[in-house]
């Protein structure tokens, strides 16, 4: 191996040494030689270990090379030199640079990390680091992919040594974080075998973190975010500049700060979890993003741009559309009539690639992902074609590093895969131990879940990715945290757990450490936060010190366990390799690979295992990559396609086009990760390591999937390496699987490898579970109790952000007929603006606003008082003049007596007033006298606007008092003039007991329930809201309407933390807003149909809620039979559109009172209008007022449905709903009934009398003539068996015409009206009819008979007679 350790960073080039993964084996030179390590092939030679796991005591000479693999630098034997570019070159594909990272991990353990840290900056200084170096490093890393050598250091090596200049995987355990998919593959192949060669790519290899590039600039570190490269080199050296990415890697010696930085970076890169374990390597990589060594053009490119090679039109790269082929065609062919080429265009010289990309959508049934457009980014990831993606895999990753890259989304995806692969790399440490390749799946799963960590240090580390820089590191970290004043008992327990866990081998120890670290992470944030550097260093130390109680216990574990972990690691490596491969091949849908949590180990190869682990742990089998990432919890629900390959298509939404994962809880919000993954890192940061660690906790949070729901997340582990782990945990968290589930999956995964170990892992997992779950109650707002009912005093200000008035009024003004002369109830009136505005502009008879907040009701009354005009009386003026004198005296006294400074202003005002009063006193008197005189004069004079020539009445006749006559007698005086028609009451509309609803009366024609349902729901639960709906229905008169503006479910979440009661109710809600409609139209409530009045536009989309109108049936005596109360069991569909009316022939003057015999009773009944409605539930009440109204039905095309004026089942709104086609056919003529012209005029539908209710009552007065004024309409009956088809025989059809109805003189004062049965042509019709029972015909006939009999009997007869129309 050509190792050139140049002390100067400039010289530090990773030569392409032919180093093979052997170096990784060197890592085996952990304190306890791992039998497995030798498995890595030539690398096994400890002496050879490139990233030598320096013996704990050794401080390896820091190697100054741009790659800053701190481990390598530390490597005493210049093994790290492999990092040098040339070595890399020499190594060609076989560079064991990864080993360097591993060794440096050991070195770090030794404490050489500090040196490494120092060197790294120097390395950073080195200009020579360039893409080539990075590539070399990557190659080396790939070779080192085994990471076993590093693993040798109690798992420190690769992970711990992640700081190794070239060991991009420093924590990767030899996986080398192959950001570049191909590199990852190669590394997996080579690294796993330990002897495998890694192809040297001039391009940055995706699999490798090209740490070298980042000379150690913090800025650089951001660039290198790609694959969690941020993780600083083990030494922490790696990227001091990288913002502590190194620390995150926990390269043993990395400082906590760096670790935090790494975490952030890695989060940016999307490898937050990786950041911790592989952080060191990551850190380097992260540095490379903006390495000063690279000129801008030399920056890592996401990929080398691969020009398209497939031209469907036969063109080539310079003529993609094959336009040149048109030049050769005959002019005739080019003529406008025939533009198609005579022949298929010849193919361009550039041949189509032999491989045809086949993009398989994740959901074959929804290839364009239109059904669930949750996150375009994820979906695109799923669809990206493998070919495009595979290209320069590393480039993609790098792009991820670069926030500014346009394709960063894809990178992220890739990155995720890489991250998984990264995890795999870390797992790779174990992987180098490749001794037991058979366990790859288990290993991958192990890597996938931090829980597995105890078993597979490498794998588990991998899983924790960044959580535990290296198994050893982890162990140390656990110890250290223990030692390092674990701030939280949890962290202490974590360490203890690590100690307790008797991991059989150093690897096991590392795993234990990792476990401890995981625990730490699960431990409260403070622990995590407790100097991530320290933790990392401790981890490194632990790796070295495997002997430490925990570590020693781990070390004690049998070598076989070591092997197991090793195999697990190799499995992880394989998994990561596969993941990378997958990443490279966009076509593959790597759900698991997308799963960050699984750490990529589960990507392709750990599929099942990783999915089991990952699913339990939040990583492997999940669909959402992001979920897996630390962010996964946050954005868990948003990133569905993260795992999928992306397709670039004008149809398929491009990444980020749909929904960006919420960055809400990112503590690192300021730094926007280049990828969503970065969010995941932030998320991990958000979660306290402890919180993150316990999958259970996360699952708890998982319910409220967006992490933002859990307030504490942001607090914890923001800067701690644990936070990186938290990334892994996040995956776990993202998975809602319970810890137990995780344990089980872990057990299964490991079980294949080592049955004995599975229990350990499970116990480990359980331990994190023991840590208090995140399920803590959220922090409730201080003002939550005050505003628990949504009684915001500034609510109107929010509603009217973009309008001078409430946008809902625009909708109401299009349906004025719903309000005019109606008794209205406004539930939740707040400060009364809507109530007052409706009263002013829509002329209701009365409107009552109620609210549960007494203060708001008081303010509403004050607001109303503004509109109450108090007439000025002259007496008042005089009286005021006198008090001014008294006031003057009083004020003078006050001025003398009160010395309070705060009263000065008031006093001054008072004084001024008094003086003015005194001064102008006489003037006022004069003014009053003049005013009085002027008023007297005015009273004698006729004002111009009041002037009406006396000759006009003589010449043209008197002006008929139309208005007064049209007004119903009920409208006494100013009853519905504005200020007098508004009332406010303080009350809770939700009754304590449903039995209290029995006392409700039908007193309203219209109920407004605007933006109140959410607050009723949150405060009183499902039962309270249902009770409120029932009460609304009960309080509506027949034909009454409910205008409902319900908040959508998404808005509930924002208010669930107001009070503990609301929080609990929120958790228990099962009656979601999308079920309101069905419920209101169900027999339990009884509304007959609904109609959408409109959806107001508002700048705040939260206020753009549809306004629904629900109509209560018109229960005339005959209608009652069809009413829900009368026949509650009657099955009918939600939308009834069965009734239509034939032309209205109004007789007698305009008023119902003029309607013949009705007139006498009409006035008397008008007075009882409010009470009559109470009788609706009984078939008989005074007169058939509603009967008459029901006859007066609005045609189906009319947009509004006037209460009491139309049949409750009229189809006016149904025509537009759900393609319900109601054709009203007259069985007589078998033709489709259409309203006559007279019906098409709205005037024919509005009663001449003032109120519709009055009109109805008018009819009642006549005893039977319930339909006042002879305004009888023919009724179209619902179909029965005889008439249900247009072909119904004429006999039945004629029988259905009720001659009896016509004969009833009481009913038909205005003339005869006939009823025609309607045929419901749509099966979906929701007619009230008894649905298609054979008895329907008999039933209808029976009704008809009853009507005929009752029709003869006076008023009640008329009522009973009413019509079958309701039937």
UniProtKB/Swiss-Prot annotation:
<feature type="compositionally biased region" description="Basic residues">
    <location>
        <begin position="78"/>
        <end position="92"/>
    </location>
</feature>
<feature type="region of interest" description="Disordered">
    <location>
        <begin position="1"/>
        <end position="107"/>
    </location>
</feature>
<feature type="compositionally biased region" description="Low complexity">
    <location>
        <begin position="330"/>
        <end position="345"/>
    </location>
</feature>
<comment type="function">
    <text>S-adenosyl-L-methionine-dependent methyltransferase that adds a methylphosphate cap at the 5'-end of 7SK snRNA, leading to stabilize it. Required for SK7, but not U6 snRNA stability. Required for dorso-ventral patterning in oogenesis and for anterior-posterior pattern formation during embryogenesis, possibly by binding and stabilizing 7SK RNA, thereby promoting formation of a repressive RNA-protein complex.</text>
</comment>
<feature type="region of interest" description="Disordered">
    <location>
        <begin position="608"/>
        <end position="734"/>
    </location>
</feature>
<dbReference type="GO" id="GO:0061629">
    <property type="term" value="F:RNA polymerase II-specific DNA-binding transcription factor binding"/>
</dbReference>
<feature type="region of interest" description="Disordered">
    <location>
        <begin position="468"/>
        <end position="559"/>
    </location>
</feature>
<keyword id="KW-0597">Phosphoprotein</keyword>
<keyword id="KW-0489">Methyltransferase</keyword>
<feature type="region of interest" description="Disordered">
    <location>
        <begin position="894"/>
        <end position="927"/>
    </location>
</feature>
<dbReference type="InterPro" id="IPR029063">
    <property type="entry name" value="SAM-dependent_MTases_sf"/>
</dbReference>
<feature type="binding site">
    <location>
        <begin position="851"/>
        <end position="852"/>
    </location>
    <ligand>
        <name>S-adenosyl-L-methionine</name>
    </ligand>
</feature>
<dbReference type="GO" id="GO:0040031">
    <property type="term" value="P:snRNA modification"/>
</dbReference>
<feature type="modified residue" description="Phosphothreonine">
    <location>
        <position position="1116"/>
    </location>
</feature>
<dbReference type="InterPro" id="IPR010675">
    <property type="entry name" value="Bin3_C"/>
</dbReference>
<feature type="region of interest" description="Disordered">
    <location>
        <begin position="381"/>
        <end position="443"/>
    </location>
</feature>
<feature type="binding site">
    <location>
        <begin position="828"/>
        <end position="830"/>
    </location>
    <ligand>
        <name>S-adenosyl-L-methionine</name>
    </ligand>
</feature>
<feature type="compositionally biased region" description="Polar residues">
    <location>
        <begin position="15"/>
        <end position="31"/>
    </location>
</feature>
<feature type="modified residue" description="Phosphoserine">
    <location>
        <position position="1123"/>
    </location>
</feature>
<feature type="compositionally biased region" description="Polar residues">
    <location>
        <begin position="1185"/>
        <end position="1203"/>
    </location>
</feature>
<feature type="compositionally biased region" description="Polar residues">
    <location>
        <begin position="1166"/>
        <end position="1177"/>
    </location>
</feature>
<feature type="compositionally biased region" description="Basic residues">
    <location>
        <begin position="901"/>
        <end position="925"/>
    </location>
</feature>
<dbReference type="GO" id="GO:0017148">
    <property type="term" value="P:negative regulation of translation"/>
</dbReference>
<feature type="compositionally biased region" description="Low complexity">
    <location>
        <begin position="60"/>
        <end position="74"/>
    </location>
</feature>
<dbReference type="GO" id="GO:0008173">
    <property type="term" value="F:RNA methyltransferase activity"/>
</dbReference>
<feature type="region of interest" description="Disordered">
    <location>
        <begin position="1150"/>
        <end position="1203"/>
    </location>
</feature>
<feature type="compositionally biased region" description="Basic residues">
    <location>
        <begin position="397"/>
        <end position="414"/>
    </location>
</feature>
<feature type="compositionally biased region" description="Low complexity">
    <location>
        <begin position="676"/>
        <end position="691"/>
    </location>
</feature>
<comment type="similarity">
    <text>Belongs to the methyltransferase superfamily.</text>
</comment>
<feature type="region of interest" description="Disordered">
    <location>
        <begin position="1345"/>
        <end position="1367"/>
    </location>
</feature>
<dbReference type="Pfam" id="PF06859">
    <property type="entry name" value="Bin3"/>
</dbReference>
<dbReference type="GO" id="GO:0017069">
    <property type="term" value="F:snRNA binding"/>
</dbReference>
<comment type="subunit">
    <text>Interacts with bicoid/bcd.</text>
</comment>
<feature type="domain" description="Bin3-type SAM">
    <location>
        <begin position="806"/>
        <end position="1115"/>
    </location>
</feature>
<protein>
    <recommendedName>
        <fullName>7SK snRNA methylphosphate capping enzyme bin3</fullName>
        <ecNumber>2.1.1.-</ecNumber>
    </recommendedName>
</protein>
<feature type="region of interest" description="Disordered">
    <location>
        <begin position="323"/>
        <end position="355"/>
    </location>
</feature>
<feature type="compositionally biased region" description="Low complexity">
    <location>
        <begin position="540"/>
        <end position="559"/>
    </location>
</feature>
<dbReference type="InterPro" id="IPR039772">
    <property type="entry name" value="Bin3-like"/>
</dbReference>
<keyword id="KW-0949">S-adenosyl-L-methionine</keyword>
<dbReference type="GO" id="GO:0005634">
    <property type="term" value="C:nucleus"/>
</dbReference>
<feature type="compositionally biased region" description="Gly residues">
    <location>
        <begin position="1260"/>
        <end position="1271"/>
    </location>
</feature>
<dbReference type="GO" id="GO:0008171">
    <property type="term" value="F:O-methyltransferase activity"/>
</dbReference>
